[in-house]
């Protein structure tokens, strides 16, 4: 069954004019929601993501509660890695921990390939369930970017400085580029499968790429990103790029064959556009503001919207994920304000 969906988010991704600014929030599904916390008392992240009905419920929850204009699939960026031979465990309070970190070209050569229908059928089944029976807004599929995935695979888990990752990149370029190629292949196959299952847009998260300078990005990372976006672009859905602490890289992203440049709060929207970012833009509220009084939030959001609405192709989002401490009522109120304020301004 083909469902009719609200396409405001997709229109903004394509740089088209919209009646109001669409909004969704990174990590909108999860830790700040009482319903989610009750589910987590019974089920682990692994159990939720491997149960299509439960995962679909968690994914749809913020759409119903906050009236956001897009859903993003509830899963972890590490989800596809076990399929290629990476032993990943998500440890509470730590994050992803990998027992077999990459240390050599031989380690890279041992990595396999992903077959999504066989390796992650539960993810594709969740997408099909959401897009055929549950959602009235577009579903965003996603993947981690090769650099961020590689950083976990080399460090063995989260890192504050990524010294091992960058040392490997500099000292073992042959192994590094082999790893980038392997991960690019995986990301391409993984995203295409999500789109074929029903995702209407995809976002690539490069959470830790801000640790790399522009020159190194161009040499060691950008070629893989160019290949990913060029291949996935053939699927005909909008593609979004997002990283954290990476304001120095936005022009590099703008050069990629993508549709939307995601910004965090460190770079004002008007400054990004002044630097030459003329594609659609997504962002860029500091999630810390969500813990402030409403009067403070409202004035801050007005400023972001006034910058974003100066040209078509703007999607409101946070610069990073929702904190567990955020009151869900604040997010609901925020979405209503974004819609109403932007509708009034755009109608002038």
UniProtKB/Swiss-Prot annotation:
It is found in: Cytoplasm. The keyword Protease does not apply. InterPro entries: UROD/MetE-like_sf (IPR038071), Uroporphyrinogen_deCO2ase_HemE (IPR006361), Uroporphyrinogen_deCOase (IPR000257). CDD domains: URO-D. The record marks 76 as: Transition state stabilizer. Keywords: Cytoplasm, Decarboxylase, Lyase, Porphyrin biosynthesis. The keyword Ion transport does not apply. PROSITE patterns: UROD_1, UROD_2. Its main location: cytoplasm. Pathway: Porphyrin-containing compound metabolism; protoporphyrin-IX biosynthesis; coproporphyrinogen-III from 5-aminolevulinate: step 4/4. GO terms for molecular function: uroporphyrinogen decarboxylase activity. Disulfide bonds: none annotated. GO terms for cellular component: cytosol. It catalyses: uroporphyrinogen III + 4 H(+) = coproporphyrinogen III + 4 CO2. One of its GO terms (biological process) is heme biosynthetic process. SUPFAM superfamilies: UROD/MetE-like. Substrate binds at residues 27-31, 46, 76, 152, 207, 320. Its EC number is 4.1.1.37. PANTHER family: METHYLTETRAHYDROFOLATE:HOMOCYSTEINE METHYLTRANSFERASE RELATED, UROPORPHYRINOGEN DECARBOXYLASE. Catalyzes the decarboxylation of four acetate groups of uroporphyrinogen-III to yield coproporphyrinogen-III. Belongs to the uroporphyrinogen decarboxylase family. Homodimer. This is Uroporphyrinogen decarboxylase. It comes from Bacillus cereus (strain ATCC 14579 / DSM 31 / CCUG 7414 / JCM 2152 / NBRC 15305 / NCIMB 9373 / NCTC 2599 / NRRL B-3711).
């Amino acid at each position: 069954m083909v469902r009719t969906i609200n396409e405001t988010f997709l229109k903004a991704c394509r740089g088209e004019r919209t009646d109001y600014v669409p909004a969704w929030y990174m990590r909108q599904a999860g830790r700040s929601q009482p319903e989610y916390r009750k589910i987590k008392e019974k089920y682990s992240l692994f159990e939720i993501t491997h149960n299509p009905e439960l995962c679909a419920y968690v994914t749809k929850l913020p759409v119903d509660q906050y009236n956001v204009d897009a859903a993003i699939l509830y899963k972890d960026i590490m989800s596809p890695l076990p399929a290629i031979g990476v032993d990943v465990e998500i440890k509470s309070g730590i994050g992803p921990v990998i027992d077999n970190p990459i240390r050599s070209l031989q380690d890279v050569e041992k990595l396999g390939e992903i077959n999504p229908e066989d390796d992650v059928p539960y993810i594709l089944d969740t997408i099909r369930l959401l897009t055929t029976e549950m959602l009235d807004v577009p579903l965003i599929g996603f993947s981690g970017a090769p650099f961020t995935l590689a950083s976990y695979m080399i460090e063995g888990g989260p890192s504050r400085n990524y010294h091992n990752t960058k040392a490997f990149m500099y000292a073992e370029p042959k192994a590094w580029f082999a790893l980038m190629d392997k991960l690019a292949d995986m990301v391409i196959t993984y995203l295409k499968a999500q789109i074929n299952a029903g995702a209407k847009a995809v976002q690539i998260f490069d959470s830790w790429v801000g640790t790399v300078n522009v020159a190194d990005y161009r040499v060691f990372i950008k070629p893989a990103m160019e290949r990913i976006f060029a291949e996935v672009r053939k699927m005909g859905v909008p593609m979004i790029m997002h990283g954290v602490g990476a304001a120095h890289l936005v022009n590099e992203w703008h050069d990629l064959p993508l549709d939307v440049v995601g910004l965090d709060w460190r770079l004002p929207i008007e400054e990004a556009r002044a630097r030459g970012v003329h594609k659609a833009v997504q962002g860029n509220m500091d999630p810390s503001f969500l813990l402030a009084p409403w009067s403070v939030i409202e004035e801050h959001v007005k400023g972001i919207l006034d910058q974003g609405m100066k040209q078509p192709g703007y999607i409101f989002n946070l610069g990073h994920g929702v904190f567990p401490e955020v009151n869900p009522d604040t997010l609901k109120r925020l979405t209503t304000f974004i819609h109403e304020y932007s509708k009034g301004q755009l109608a002038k």
